[in-house]
Amino acid sequence: MNTETLSDISDEIKSHYPTMLQSWGIIGISILFKVLFTPVFFLSDYTGKEQTFLVYQVLALGSTFAYAHLRRKKTTGISTYDFNPASTKIMVLLAVSTICLLVSIRVPLVSVLPRPEWLPDLSKTFTVNNPYSIVSLVLVAPVLEELIFRGIILDGLLHKYSPVKSIVFSSMLFGLIHIHPIQLVSAFLIGLFAGWVYYRTSKISLCIFIHFINNFLITLVVLFYTDDTSTDTLAATGYRHYLIYLFILMAVGGVAIYLLNKEFNTQGRNTASFSSPSRMSNLNEQTK
């Protein structure tokens, strides 16, 4: 017999953070911190641009996470995140899925959506042999951004809204903070994948791993190739050959995601921890 009452579930759902409106508030706070810490770049003449960007990333993203984390803790009493690793099989499937998704999306986007002139060319901003740029893009960004967008925003939304609405909305916000048109689209799609993985596992560690693979590959491309190089390479390869190449990548990625889904089903989902609207609907039916 189900002893859970409508009042119990209603109170539980109200206690979670954030709502969609509050999620927009987190984005606003993020923009505010980015503006407030902009003067840090004046130090680049003394410390170097890579070191300065690393400090800026830590301050801006770290402050945003601290704000959202404290709000979440105050509202829900929750202050922990699941950093437990997954099996080697899952990690390999995640890596393959992410690589296929990234390559099949980014190369055609580069040829269709060239970098706007008002945006800086990162290949001229960072040097490949500088460890600070690698730490900024491959370590700091994946950890802090995933804690914000999956660990806090998506986690809170999943307790209030349907999984599809929660994942799409949080991914849209994740895409919007990446100003570059190519990054916006690819970040949205990677966000959908990471969001689905988080919904199935509740493990922030897996989302960080996906983001790490994504940023690591993008960093290599940005540091070794320009946008023009990518476009020329696509033209030289031939669009027919590229379509075959794209189909193979999508097929491999699709198989990897299928196997990943089977693995999640085998190991059991953690989705029961989320208070979905379906629970409210079912309970309403029981109380009629």
Regions found by a protein language model. Give the residues of each.
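Short, Lys/Arg-rich, polar N-terminal cytosolic tail immediately upstream
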Residues: 1-17
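Alpha-helical transmembrane segments in multi-pass membrane proteins
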Residues: 24-72, 90
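Hydrophobic core of alpha-helical transmembrane segments in multi-pass integral membrane proteins
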Residues: 29-35, 58-69, 95-107, 243-264
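Functionally important transmembrane alpha-helices
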Residues: 33-40, 183-239
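Juxtamembrane helix-loop-helix connectors linking adjacent transmembrane helices
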Residues: 76-143, 155, 159, 232, ...
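Residues that define the loop-to-transmembrane-helix transition and helix capping
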Residues: 132, 164-165, 182, 204-205
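Membrane-interface helix/loop boundary segments of multi-pass membrane proteins
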Residues: 144-169, 196-203
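C-terminal membrane module of polytopic membrane proteins
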Residues: 212-288
